[in-house]
Amino acid sequence: MSPQTETKASVGFKAGVKDYKLNYYTPEYETKDTDILAAFRVTPQPGVPPEEAGASVAAESSTGTWTTVWTDGLTSLDRYKGRCYHIEPVAGEENQYIAYVAYPLDLFEEGSVTNMFTSIVGNVFGFKALRALRLEDLRIPNAYIKTFQGPPHGIQVERDKLNKYGRPLLGCTIKPKLGLSAKNYGRAVYECLRGGLDFTKDDENVNSQPFMRWRDRFLFCAEAIFKSQAETGEIKGHYLNATAGTCEEMMKRAVFARELGVPIVMHDYLTGGFTANTSLAHYCRDNGLLLHIHRAMHAVIDRQKNHGMHFRVLAKALRLSGGDHVHSGTVVGKLEGERDITLGFVDLLRDDFVEKDRSRGIYFTQDWVSLPGVLPVASGGIHVWHMPALTEIFGDDSVLQFGGGTLGHPWGNAPGAVANRVALEACVKARNEGRDLAREGNEIIREASKWSPELAAACEVWKEIKFEFPAMD
């Protein structure tokens, strides 16, 4: 045995499985302004104490490994380790706890959501000591936020670019989402924009398929944008989906969109990845393009109540990575979204400072230190009868996006767009006059339909449509 080995053995080095709570559960720790704070919903395996479960999360998502290693002595683990500093039981749930973990900022690369997530929501989610694990919220410190560009432009700059103020923006996803030729697709875009919408949108899975290659779609949509602008006198846009199989191909599509002179492109930020998304956001700021973000795949991550990650965390990550719009659910349509919880992360997208409010799912006070805001996009199973509720819930700084609620109009796409625009203008006017949209919404829509045959037809078609299913989990 070498002298060095003998020395190590003599001071108590011992192989074996670690008891994490001895080093990583530190209830006496006072968090720093520079720490990233995380709130995890922890479900330990039977027989695992909550303190050990919380400590294992802190360890496995920072400096820990399952046994003592010689190289622990070559660095300051106390400086770099994550710490579980508080644990509380979840009310009404058996064997579930909220474990609060603080991470020193040195653990994370500047300006990289990819690196932050690789640590905090990485291998620890498969740890055997835990039956389930869910990241409920993150507090991003000011020092780390300042290493990100964030959204390419933000809410105010977008309004200035579009010259549109005092109301939500209106959009429409072109349907059917797959199968149209580029020319027919462009025709649908033109009809919707001419009818009064601000934007139309590629569906998230429209990339470059055999029936419609991306370059053809971009050209026909650009023609539709410019023709509708000339006829209406309003600035129009279509979310051209630049998502591709490689970052290089994605950037090629964004460059072509800029060369065409269109105002906005789109990215599927979860399936495309945060590295690609951040690269595209930087390009969009440098080249004057707005960036619309779709959240395809989010429900795989956030729908389970005790495992995965809440969408408010994905929303915060998107604001760091960059996007001017992001889909946020509707509260009233076909996709899941509880009102208070949804409005909680909508505020985290838009506002510069958001106070802790557990009733809305906000575990930490978040200061965005003037990082530009993101417009929430309400989309999924909505129609004209939802307009008062959507206007009241989301306010002016939002995009209300009707796919089937535009293209399903019995008279065609342009009348469907007219119906939505008339309904929106009626709701905004009524709100500005002091009327209660929540209580008088249906009456406001009926009054407007008396002088808009397009709206009257839409009201008749969708008067019985609801998406109401009992929650089973």
Curated annotation (Swiss-Prot):
Claim: Chloroplast is one of the keywords in the record: yes
N6-carboxylysine, modified sites: 201
Cofactor: how and how many bound: Binds 1 Mg(2+) ion per subunit.
CDD domains, sorted: RuBisCO_large_I
Protein residues bound to substrate: 123, 173, 177, 295, 327, 379
Signal peptide range in chain numbering: none
Listed EC numbers: 4.1.1.39
Residues annotated for Mg(2+) binding in this entry: 201, 203-204
Active site per the UniProt annotation: 175 (proton acceptor), 294 (proton acceptor)
Post-translational modification: The disulfide bond which can form in the large chain dimeric partners within the hexadecamer appears to be associated with oxidative stress and protein turnover.
Residues flagged as site, Transition state stabilizer: 334
Residues excised as propeptide: 1-2
GO CC annotation: chloroplast
Keywords tagged on the record: Acetylation, Calvin cycle, Carbon dioxide fixation, Chloroplast, Disulfide bond, Lyase, Magnesium, Metal-binding, Methylation, Monooxygenase, Oxidoreductase, Photorespiration, Photosynthesis, Plastid
Record-listed N6,N6,N6-trimethyllysine modification sites: 14
Pfam families: RuBisCO_large, RuBisCO_large_N
Any one GO biological process: reductive pentose-phosphate cycle
Catalytically driven reaction(s): 2 (2R)-3-phosphoglycerate + 2 H(+) = D-ribulose 1,5-bisphosphate + CO2 + H2O; D-ribulose 1,5-bisphosphate + O2 = 2-phosphoglycolate + (2R)-3-phosphoglycerate + 2 H(+)
Localization annotation: Plastid, Chloroplast
A GO term, aspect molecular function: monooxygenase activity
Miscellaneous: The basic functional RuBisCO is composed of a large chain homodimer in a 'head-to-tail' conformation. In form I RuBisCO this homodimer is arranged in a barrel-like tetramer with the small subunits forming a tetrameric 'cap' on each end of the 'barrel'.
HAMAP family referenced in this protein's UniProt entry, alphabetically: RuBisCO_L_type1
PANTHER family, per database record: RIBULOSE BISPHOSPHATE CARBOXYLASE (PTHR42704), RIBULOSE BISPHOSPHATE CARBOXYLASE LARGE CHAIN (PTHR42704:SF15)
Subunit and partners: Heterohexadecamer of 8 large chains and 8 small chains; disulfide-linked. The disulfide link is formed within the large subunit homodimers.
Role played: RuBisCO catalyzes two reactions: the carboxylation of D-ribulose 1,5-bisphosphate, the primary event in carbon dioxide fixation, as well as the oxidative fragmentation of the pentose substrate in the photorespiration process. Both reactions occur simultaneously and in competition at the same active site.
Protein name stated in the entry: Ribulose bisphosphate carboxylase large chain
